[in-house]
C-alpha cells in the first residue's frame, strides 16, 4: 500500500523542469555572447599571431581555440548550476534519482543552448557570408592557400570546437548536480529552522 502511494506521488510529478532548463540555457547563451564580445574587445583574432609566409590567413590561432573552449565550459557551468538551483523539488524520490535528474537537467541545458546557439549563429552568418562571398573569394585567390592546408586549418578549428562542446556538456551536468544539491540543502535548512521551537 505504501509503495503504491509513493509511486502515485512520483507519477504526479514531472521529472523534467523545462522552465529551469530554458532559464539555464538562456543564461548560458547570454554569458557566451558577453564573453565572446569581451574576447573580441581584447583583440582576439582567428588568425595566428605569428606572421604567415603568404601574408594572409593560413594559420589557425590555437589561443582562440582554447579561449572558445573555455567560454563554452564557463557558460555551460553557469547555465547548469542555475537549472539545478531553479528546478522544483521532487517528493518521495531517492537521492540517487534526484542526482541523476539534476545532471540530466544540466545536459539538457547544454543541448538546448548548443542548438539555439547554432541556429542563431547560422541565422547571422548566412546573410553575412553571402554579402562577403565575392571579397572573400578574391582574398583567397590572392593569398593562394593550398587546399590541404585549408583542410588542416578547418580540422584544427573543429577539434577545438568538439573538445569544448564535450567539456561543456560534462561541466553543465556536474554544475547542475551541485546546484540541485545546494538547493536541497538550503531547503532542508530552512524547514528545520522553522520547525525549531522558539525559546
PLM regions: where:
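Hydrophobic core segments of alpha-helical transmembrane domains in multi-pass membrane transport
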Residues: 27-36, 113-122, 126, 161-176
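Perimembrane loop-to-helix junctions flanking transmembrane segments
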Residues: 46-61, 141-144
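Pore-lining and gate-forming transmembrane alpha-helices of multi-pass membrane transport proteins
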Residues: 56-68, 72, 101, 105, ...
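Alpha-helical transmembrane segments and their helix-start/interface "positive-inside/aromatic belt" motifs
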Residues: 11-30, 64, 101-115, 174
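Functional transmembrane-helix hotspots
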Residues: 118-140
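Alpha-helical transmembrane segments of integral membrane proteins, especially early/N-terminal helices
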Residues: 22-41, 71-73
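Membrane-helix interface motif
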Residues: 35-50, 124-132
